[in-house]
């Protein structure tokens, strides 16, 4: 099993301890040799050589530590750059997600449009038919009055004579006695609507006509007034009868 290599810090601490021990031995040896005036040749030289050797190793290790310090500073700068790049990558990833969502939506809408186009091509209608249909609508004046319309013009949007005869007033004049001359159903008037026989038959007949009905106690008078001749018609009839009687007497 391989022994793990010591770090630079541990090696420096070990060398410093050795230097400290050697320095103490040198100092103690020199102190003893002076006090006792005893000197053993070669002992101080060995300690000094060992001290110089340890100092050389310490200097070499300090160079290594200095280079490692520079490397550590470079690593810190690179770590900051990596963090910045990582933030840029995350931002770009977010933008790519948004672009993916937009593209997916656009692709879905494009597919739906293609389906609509295919469906329209399968059920295509010629432009001539559209023009004919538009001409029919404009010619019948179903949506607006003619440009040359004047009061008295029977054309639309006012109802024609046939539509008037088929409408509410025409039906009221042709109803049987028990259906019109009597009182209208109370529930119909209470609900504010006309009976089914008097319901409007055309779109131009407004439903407001049923809302303008009088109360039940006045319905008979309202119907009789609407069905009966007015004062001007009575005077015209009297004048015509007088003229006819005078002409017959003259002929006699």
Swiss-Prot record:
GO terms for cellular component: core mediator complex; mediator complex. Residues 241-252 have a biased composition (Low complexity). Keywords: Activator, Coiled coil, Nucleus, Transcription, Transcription regulation. GO terms for molecular function: transcription coregulator activity. It is found in: Nucleus. GO terms for biological process: regulation of transcription by RNA polymerase II. InterPro entries: Mediator_Med4 (IPR019258). Residues 213-252 are annotated as: Disordered. Transmembrane segments: none annotated. The keyword Nuclease does not apply. Component of the Mediator complex. Component of the Mediator complex, a coactivator involved in the regulated transcription of nearly all RNA polymerase II-dependent genes. Mediator functions as a bridge to convey information from gene-specific regulatory proteins to the basal RNA polymerase II transcription machinery. Mediator is recruited to promoters by direct interactions with regulatory proteins and serves as a scaffold for the assembly of a functional preinitiation complex with RNA polymerase II and the general transcription factors. This is Mediator of RNA polymerase II transcription subunit 4.
